[in-house]
Amino acid sequence: MQTPYQTNEAGHLSIGGVDANELAQRFGTPLYAYDVGAMRQQMRDFRRVFEERHLKYAVSYASKAFATIAMYEVAAQEGMHIDVVSGGEIYTALRAKFPMADVSFNGNNKSVEELTMAIENGLGLSLIHISEPTRLRCI
């Protein structure tokens, strides 16, 4: 069975060509390390499937998985949209200067403050609870 995991000549896990043991020694543990090259390739692969078929599309990164300025910068560079689920993720997207027209605010239990933040910054909204239109009228 083939896996996306690579080992180096020392038999250690290699992340983007870097020895994971060396990363742990340098930065301590627990440590989150991502292979940005592999992530970029996956983003391109998703987009290519739609482009080859000449389909109108938007591929969104579900930022609840990992919401940082650096991650949003990579997503923007690769032509991705992002899906946010909290005011904190909206704030991070703003700090990353992510194009707000490419951000969708999803999720349940959105506060009036979060909805206001989303509207004021031009985000798309996914309303999934019956009370959300009522909350929108308060804004």
Could you describe each region identified by the protein language model?
Residues 128-139:
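Single conserved hydrophobic/aromatic residue that forms the stacking wall/gate
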Residues 1-125, 131:
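A charged N-terminal "starter" segment
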